[in-house]
Structure formats: C-alpha cells, structure tokens
Amino acid sequence: MWRITPMRRLEMEDAGNQPMPPSLAPDVDRDRIQGLEQGVGPLFHRRYRTTIRDGSLTAHEVIALIERDPNVVAPTEFARFMRLAGQSGSMKVGDEYLVRMPGPWDGPVRVVDTTPTSFRLATLRGHLEAGQIEFRAHEEDGLLFEIESWARSGDHLSNLLYDQFRMAKEVQLHMWTSVLEGVVRLTKGRRSGMITIETRRVHVDG
C-alpha cells in the first residue's frame, strides 16, 4: 500500500488562536454533524498542496469532474466514496457520502458548501474525526490543488490512534496525498516540485 512520493512535511505546535473552519451557512442541515466542539483532544489544522503544470484542465473543470465522481481521484484500491444521499451528478449541499476504507476507517460526511472551484465536507456522527475538510483548485503559475482540514478526533480511541500512536495520521496522510496524485493524473499534467503537507497541532481546552 505504501509508496515513496516526494513530499515536504512541516509540523508545528501552536498555542495561539485556534484555526477555525468556515462557518456553516444558515440553510445547512446540522443534524448529525460532528463539529469540532464534539471532538476529543487537540485540533489539527492540515494543508496538503500540489502544483500541476502542463495540464489540460482548468480549476473549474477539475472540481466539476471530482464533484461528479470523487472516485476519479481517490485511491480506490484503498478508499472509495459511496453516495448515500442526493442525486447522481454534481455535488450539492446536503449530499452525503461514506468514505469506505479497510478496517475501522469508514467515514460518513455531508457536503456543506460548493463553489465553482471548491467543495467542503463536514464529518457526521460515527466518523473517526470531528470537523471539516475542503478541496479547492485555482490557477496560480500552473494549477494549485489544495486539501485543507480542521479536525479533532471523534472519540478517545480515535485520539489515541491519531495523536499517540500516529496510526490514523499516517493512514490519512496516505489517503490525501494519493488524492493529490490522482488530481495530477486527471489533468494529464505533471507535478511541479514536492507535495507539501503542513500540520498545526493546537491544544483545545475541554
């Protein structure tokens, strides 16, 4: 399952202001959403980035294809998106997916925001994490694709696996770096430089 991918990892302890995800719009269904306040342990704010050159797709086109079927960039031998609620076609706010993974890693999520160049998911009750994750693309000296997450562990066992044993953290790293590589393939371009992963670990009271 594991492979060598050129990447640069930066990890920081941060005692400053808590990085917060964007607020949910008033019309977003909050039922079963597992927000940061329901989480356990520290807050992890993570950014995964890759720059793509010589690709054949615009930022808008990339997001449109992924919204139609996230599995076009998912490492489907390891993880697969299954739509549980919503119509086929492009993502819409309120659609729900189960990210099916081996072992205890299955993750139910709901679409809480979409734009022409981004979409954002919130974790639902039963997910190993509590928080949100956003996928976005924009054209900046090539095509920059980013995945940004704001999350705490969903329960004490998840916190042990993620923060203490680091097992879940490495599974997550593999998942999202694989998605970035999938985006590169989707565009038929080439990755410029290394994939970068930045992690801020923030202590949360309570």
Where are these predicted regions, by residue range?
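Short, flexible segments with low predicted structural confidence
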Residues: 33-38, 108-109, 147, 151
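Hydrophobic-ligand binding "helix-grip"
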Residues: 100-140
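Hydrophobic ligand-binding cavity/cleft-lining segments
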Residues: 1-100
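Beta-strand secondary-structure signal
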Residues: 47-49, 98, 120, 134-136, ...
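A conserved amphipathic terminal alpha-helix motif
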Residues: 154-205
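Hydrophobic/basic alpha-helical segments enriched in Actinobacteria
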Residues: 78-81, 121, 178
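Beta-strand/loop substructures that line and gate deep hydrophobic ligand-binding cavities in soluble
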Residues: 126-170
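Short, intrinsically disordered, mixed-charge
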Residues: 64-72, 126, 181, 185-188
